[in-house]
Amino acid sequence: MDFQQLADVAEKWCSSTPFELIAAEETERRMDFYADPGVSFYVLCPDNGCGDSFHVWSESEDCLPFLQLAQDYISSCGKKTLHEVLEKVFKSFRPLLGLPDADDDAFEEYSADVEEEEPEADHPQMGVSQQ
């Protein structure tokens, strides 16, 4: 995928997150992202013919520890798309952005569903005769 296509993917991703693509350097194949309150990171994109993977980093010491999850994900087996990498970065930064953890949301929804169930009526068990 050429760099402009990657930048388009990044712009589309930004439209559904608090992040903004603040710089896209084609010569360096680098994209810089920013979100309030001071959360920033950049992605280095691999060349088309190169087997390299994406690389994420932050020049902010406050942000850098949160990128470990995304960095581990990128270095794991298999090719990753830019969208997959950005989603993992977003998940990593949720606490810094003041958002609930994505996994917590799923658990709360599941718990809420369980709590809303009405008690089941007593049904006769199969194979047990009632006399």
From Swiss-Prot:
GO cellular component: cytoplasm
Reported modifications of this chain: Phosphorylation at Tyr-34 is essential for its ability to promote megakaryocyte differentiation.
GO biological process, one term: positive regulation of megakaryocyte differentiation
Domain of life per record: Eukaryota
Amino-acid biosynthesis among keywords: no
One Pfam family from the record: DUF4581
Keyword Amino-acid biosynthesis attached: no
Positions with biased composition (Acidic residues): 107-120
Subcellular location as annotated: Cytoplasm
Tissue specificity of this protein: Expressed in the thymus, bone marrow and spleen.
InterPro entries xref list: Maturin (IPR027892)
Keywords: Cytoplasm, Developmental protein, Phosphoprotein
Region ranges (Disordered): 107-131
PTM sites of type Phosphotyrosine: Y34
Function: Promotes megakaryocyte differentiation by enhancing ERK and JNK signaling as well as up-regulating RUNX1 and FLI1 expression. Represses NF-kappa-B transcriptional activity by inhibiting phosphorylation of RELA at 'Ser- 536'. May be involved in early neuronal development.
PANTHER family: MATURIN
Similarity comment: Belongs to the MTURN family.
Full protein name: Maturin
Native species: Mus musculus (Mouse)
Highest classification ranks of the organism: Eukaryota, Metazoa, Chordata, Craniata, Vertebrata
Gene: Mturn
